[in-house]
Structures are given as C-alpha cells and as structure tokens.
From Swiss-Prot:
Enzymatic reactions: cytidine(32) in tRNA + S-sulfanyl-L-cysteinyl-[cysteine desulfurase] + AH2 + ATP = 2-thiocytidine(32) in tRNA + L-cysteinyl-[cysteine desulfurase] + A + AMP + diphosphate + H(+)
Subunit structure: Homodimer.
UniProt pathway: tRNA modification
UniProtKB keywords: 4Fe-4S, ATP-binding, Cytoplasm, Iron, Iron-sulfur, Magnesium, Metal-binding, Nucleotide-binding, RNA-binding, Transferase, tRNA processing, tRNA-binding
Molecular function GO terms recorded: 4 iron, 4 sulfur cluster binding; ATP binding; magnesium ion binding; sulfurtransferase activity; tRNA binding
GO biological process, one term: tRNA thio-modification
Pfam families attached to this UniProt entry: ATP_bind_3 (PF01171)
Its biological purpose: Catalyzes the ATP-dependent 2-thiolation of cytidine in position 32 of tRNA, to form 2-thiocytidine (s(2)C32). The sulfur atoms are provided by the cysteine/cysteine desulfurase (IscS) system.
Localization per record: Cytoplasm
Superkingdom of the source species: Bacteria
More about this protein: The thiolation reaction likely consists of two steps: a first activation step by ATP to form an adenylated intermediate of the target base of tRNA, and a second nucleophilic substitution step of the sulfur (S) atom supplied by the hydrosulfide attached to the Fe-S cluster.
Organism: Legionella pneumophila (strain Paris)
Annotated [4Fe-4S] cluster binding sites: C112, C115, C203
This protein's name: tRNA-cytidine(32) 2-sulfurtransferase
Length: 283
C-alpha cells in the first residue's frame, strides 16, 4: 500500500479485498495471471492486487500478461517501462488477431465478440502452458450491470459476468476482483496514478455500440435515483426463482402439490403446451 493512500485508493483496496473474501477468489499458493490490456481497469486491478499481495505476506503470486493484437498504432514502450519500475513479472505476447477480425467482420459491425473470443483462447492457452491456475480480469461493477441490462434487452436472458468462473477448458478459475468497484473510482485512481493508458482504437472507432447506449440509459436512471446501479448489482445476488418464469428453476406446473387441503386433489392438464406453439415467433 502507498505510504499515504488517497481516499479512493483505500476504497478500492476495501472493495477488492471484500470481493476476494466473499467469493474465495484467491487462496494461498495461487499463481494469478492478471490480464493487462493497457486500459484503466486492468492497470487498477494489477496495482491493487499487487498491494494486496504484499499485504498478505506474498501468500500468492501475480504475473502481468499483455496481448499485443497487432493493432495499428500500438505502442507498449511506456507500459514496459511502468512494469519494470514496479518490478512486476510480466510478458507482452504478440499475436495478430487484428487482421483476422478485420477480415471476418464487415465494416460497421461490432468487432467485440470475435475479438474477445480469439483473445480468450490465447489467454487460456498461455495460462495453461505457464502454470497459472487463476486468471484475473478487470471488469468492474458497472461492466456487470451493463452486461445484465444488455442480456435482458438484446438477448432475452438474464445473465452477466460472474465474479468467479470455471474456464471453458475446465483448467482455470477466472476471477473478477473489481466486481464491487465503481468505474468512477477507477477513473479517479487512474488519474492519480498517471497510468500509461494504451487506447483501443479498434473498439473506440465504433461509436454506435450497444454497451454505450445501455451505459447512457443506466446513467440517466441514476440521475433520478442514485441507487439504481447498486440496486442492479444487488439483484445479481438476490435471485428469486419463484418470482420469475424459468421452469428449470421452479416447478410451476406442480405447485398444486404444495396446497394445504383437506383432501388430495388429482391434477390433470386441461391444455397441452404443444397446442399453442407458434413456429419461429417469440412472445
């Protein structure tokens, strides 16, 4: 920890430490690979995790991994210098995913899905080859609630970014230690620390992304009620299956079995769901 930490730094240490404890993200002896993209979120994650590592008495390891995706204008000279000054073990790996994305995705369409899929495969492979059992990502509270809103509005399902996840290849645990942290605090901290931010020109050139629209919507609602963002985060931790409609999690069809009646009631379906199927149409 800094000799004289600012109020926002104390706040970040508190909420990151709380998330790690709440979800048992890091255990003694873990080798944690922190994905450092060069953005404010990942710089903050690496800095705070490094301070918590020192505070713990080095009970776990951290390693910074940066993927150079060969985007035009990429310059990691300042990033390399910063990592060297902090004495954080690291590697910057170059893989040209940029050309693949540009080739596969039509102009004007969102690159995020393919780009993240390619990046994820490289990250998992690197972690496996180098013996890292935990992969830390820099998603924060606002990322989680925006993803929730996007899933509901555009995909028709209720999902977000879990704080802790078993990787697709079942060989790693992915953690998001900043899941309680507000983006505005990260912005303040990044400014205080003067991180050598590397902009993502690939994403920044697409102004019409759904995520920006959803972020704007949540911000507008928060003007009227500042508790909206925290309420949305709380909703992710307070699921009530009986108040929803997913029959995989609640046995709506046979609720009659729980009735307290003097005599048992024989339940027989009047309608069959197949009678009401409408092909290729969503209610």
């Amino acid at each position: 920890m800094s000799s004289n930490p600012s109020s926002v730094e104390k706040k970040l240490l508190h909420y990151t430490g709380k998330a790690i404890a709440d979800f048992n993200m890091i255990q003694r002896g873990d080798r944690v690979m922190v994905c450092l993209s060069g953005g404010k979120d990942s710089f903050t994650l690496l800095t705070i995790l490094n301070q918590l590592r020192i505070k713990s008495g080095n009970k776990f390891e951290i390693f910074a991994f940066t993927l150079d995706q060969a985007q035009p204008g990429w310059n990691d000279a300042c990033l390399r210098q910063w990592l060297a000054e902090k004495s954080i073990p690291h590697e910057i790996l170059t893989r040209d995913t940029y050309s693949i994305v540009k080739e596969k995705i039509p102009e004007g369409k969102t690159y995020c899905s393919l780009c993240s899929r390619l990046r994820r495969g490289i990250i998992y492979r690197y972690a496996e080859e180098n013996g890292f059992n935990k992969i830390a990502l820099g998603h924060h509270r606002d990322d989680l609630i925006r993803t929730l809103m996007m899933s509901i509005l555009y995909n028709g399902d209720i999902r977000s970014m879990p704080p802790k996840l078993l990787s697709d290849n079942k060989k790693h645990i992915v953690i998001r230690p900043l899941c309680y942290v507000q983006e505005k605090d990260i912005i303040t901290f990044a400014s205080e620390q003067a991180f050598p931010i590397i902009p993502c020109n690939l994403c920044g050139s697409q102004e019409n992304l759904m995520r920006k629209k959803v972020a704007s919507l949540i911000d507008q609602l928060a003007i009227e009620n500042p508790k909206v963002p925290s309420n949305m985060l709380h909703a992710l931790q307070s699921l009530k299956p009986s108040q929803l409609m997913d029959q995989n999690f609640w046995n709506f069809k046979n609720l009659e079995d729980g009735l307290e009646t003097a005599q048992s009631i024989q339940c027989e379906e009047v309608f069959n769901a197949q009678e009401f199927e409408i092909e290729d149409e969503k209610i």
